[in-house]
């Protein structure tokens, strides 16, 4: 069964990430399904550089809760987060670990179905 996704947004566009942070939040109360595409061009550093990307949801755009969907990234490539369990606002939190980690060419795009 194919699904037509109605909205596409780019949250991060071909950037280098070396510290933990969050994408900007988006109001999504009218959407019922989300797919986040996380593309990483390269990974550098020592002690196993890791980027954990966690989908978060909020009822008020102030207090944030982890949703069940996350992905752990240790190498270049494509990764996907899917969810149909989120509130009015969403964002992606990314946590970076390792020694001198750099994740280059990072792009995060979300598609939602309304």
Regions found by a protein language model. Give the residues of each.
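Solvent-exposed serine/threonine-rich low-complexity stretches and specific carbohydrate-binding patches
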Residues: 10, 66-74
